[in-house]
């Protein structure tokens, strides 16, 4: 299991489009990928789970990956968050 803390930096936070991108990205990996915030846990491959976290701009989350390609899954997910979910702002 590997994990990393990140900050949601895009203006709209974890909204539907960002959650969909996250789900599309993480389903490419065999590893389980979870987002954790203040005791809540969300399967990153499930849009509704991600939306339930209500991650707004400035929210700190932990990305956690477990499985055979866990490091690649973590690194790629962190890059997506750092890239503001590829949204222009």
Model-found features: residue ranges?
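Short amphipathic
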Residues: 1-10
């Amino acid at each position: 299991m590997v994990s990393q803390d990140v900050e949601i930096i895009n203006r709209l936070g974890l909204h539907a489009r960002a959650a969909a991108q996250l789900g599309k990205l993480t389903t490419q990996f065999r590893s389980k990928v979870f987002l954790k915030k203040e005791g809540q846990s969300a399967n990153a491959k499930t849009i509704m789970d991600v939306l339930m976290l209500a991650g707004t701009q400035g929210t700190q989350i932990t990305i956690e990956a477990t499985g055979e390609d866990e490091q690649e899954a973590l690194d790629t997910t962190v890059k997506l968050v750092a890239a503001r979910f590829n949204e222009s702002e």
